[in-house]
A protein has these predicted regions:
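A glycine- and small-residue-enriched flexible loop/hinge signal that marks low-structured segments
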Residues: 2-47, 52-60, 66-67, 75-371, ...
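Soluble or luminal CAZymes and related metallo-dependent hydrolases
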Residues: 72
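C-terminal edge-of-domain segments
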Residues: 406-438
């Protein structure tokens, strides 16, 4: 008879033998999450309506025409180019939901919008066509660019949908020099579109949100959304708005317009990319504006000082360059509980990084999985200390040691209480120097 063997849960076996458990050593998963994820709603001439769609920076560069309907260099994509200068991933939302798809005898545009009117169908005879069996080559053009070719097609039902059109299910193919799609329209942007966007955005993770609408009711809506998400839900991000002095660390208020239009909100995408894409150990102070717009920097020294005092994110001119004046948010009401440090976006980046990373760590590794005993709390302490040590290694915080973190049992058997002291590092901004001449 064979000896006993296998694995064990408790030491209650009867037969002699070797009972061996193989368990992976727990790995600390308290790593720093990456930044550079942002979201923004925009009016567009092409693309899916009424829902968020995600675009990576590399996809935008290579496939902008398929995604947005235009070549990468087109003027219509300037807001997208601006935001991708410093963002890696963007959750876009196309505003307007009542657009009409352009169409012709053979095809219907993939999406509603005026860009569909630039599509056209060209049908020529295939080289193998005969009277008994006509064959056609069917081309789809966007402007002057061929975007699809299907050769040797006998019937319209043989055509396969492409990135630009869906073919109609009935009809007869015939030689066509150029048949445009017509009657495509953009949907009218309504205030309710912004609420639809915000409702959908709750399910996504991002570092910054932007809004190019300057209407007071809309900016107030976005500011309230950011405050609710940050303070009530625990989802930490900053929202970039135009001249919205919300007196809140979660709202960045951009003051500058353009030289051609001082009230233009065109800089919002660039700032959104910067706020979301700047590393946790970096500051955007004195960052050079590398976008395509002519920024209005017609401010006096006093106006710049007042802008900082009121909580405005501003640009100013340094020789031939346009630079960020200082990397601040709209918070100005300093209290004993909230010092002036909370007006620094670099400080908020550090605090948001800690909040988001530890929440993810707890949810994935501890929630409902690790017992709330001394060993479990020590494990959580170890992971938090490891996370903060990484922040200190990249000079995002300073003067940190394990003694700054305590993990204790809460008021109930299921709760755990963490007390955490951190000192965020900020970049140098002012130099006070006294030179003694002998």
């Amino acid at each position: 008879m064979a000896l006993g063997g296998g694995t064990f849960l408790v030491q209650n076996k009867v037969l002699p033998g070797a009972y061996i458990n193989f368990i992976s050593v727990a790995q600390a998963s308290a790593t720093l999450s990456d930044r550079g994820i942002v979201t923004i709603p925009l009016a567009m001439n092409w693309g899916p309506e009424g829902k968020i769609f995600t675009v990576e920076q590399a996809d935008f560069i290579k496939n902008s025409q398929k995604i947005f309907g235009y070549a990468y260099t087109a003027d219509e994509l300037k807001p997208m180019r601006e935001i991708f200068l410093h963002a890696k991933t963007v959750h876009f939302f196309r505003l307007g939901t009542s657009g009409v798809k352009a169409a012709n005898t053979y095809a219907t545009a993939k999406y509603p919008g005026t860009r569909g009117n630039d599509l056209r169908t060209v049908i020529t005879a295939n080289e193998n066509t005969t009277e008994q069996k006509p064959l056609f080559d069917v081309e789809t053009f966007l402007g002057t660019v061929q975007v699809d070719l299907q050769e040797g097609v006998a019937a319209i039902t043989d055509l396969k949908a492409n990135a630009y059109v869906d073919w109609k299910s009935s009809g007869t193919l015939s030689l066509t020099a150029s048949l445009p799609l017509t009657d495509g329209t953009n949907g009218t942007v309504a205030d309710s579109d912004y609420q639809t966007y915000l409702d959908q955005a709750e399910a996504y993770t991002f570092n910054a949100m932007g809004c190019t609408e300057s209407k007071a009711t809309i900016t107030a809506l976005f500011a309230a959304f950011a405050k609710r998400m940050r303070d009530d839900v625990g989802k930490k991000f900053q929202v970039v708005l135009f001249r919205k002095l919300a007196d809140y660390e979660g709202v960045v208020s951009v003051k500058n317009g353009l030289t051609s239009d001082k009230t233009s909100t065109a800089l919002i995408p660039w700032v959104t990319g910067v706020i979301g894409g700047t590393a946790v150990n970096k500051s955007a102070t004195n960052m050079t504006y590398d976008g395509e717009y002519d920024v209005d920097t017609d401010f006096t020294q006093t106006q710049l000082e007042n802008g900082i005092k009121e909580g405005s994110f501003m640009f100013h001119r340094v020789d031939e360059a346009v630079c960020v004046l200082t990397d601040i948010n709209s918070f100005i009401s300093i209290t004993d509980e909230k010092s002036s440090d909370f007006s620094s976006n670099q400080t908020i980046r550090v605090l948001d990084q800690i909040a988001n990373d530890i929440a993810v760590l707890f949810g994935k590794k501890y929630l409902g999985k690790v017992p709330n005993d001394a060993a479990g709390r020590i494990s959580l302490w170890n992971d938090i200390v490891k996370h903060h040590t990484e922040l200190q290694d990249i000079r995002a915080i300073e003067n940190f040691s394990g003694e700054n973190v305590t993990v204790e049992k809460g008021d109930t058997k299921k709760s755990v209480v963490v007390t955490d002291y951190v000192t965020p590092v900020n970049a140098m901004e002012q130099l006070y120097m006294t030179v003694y001449v002998q």
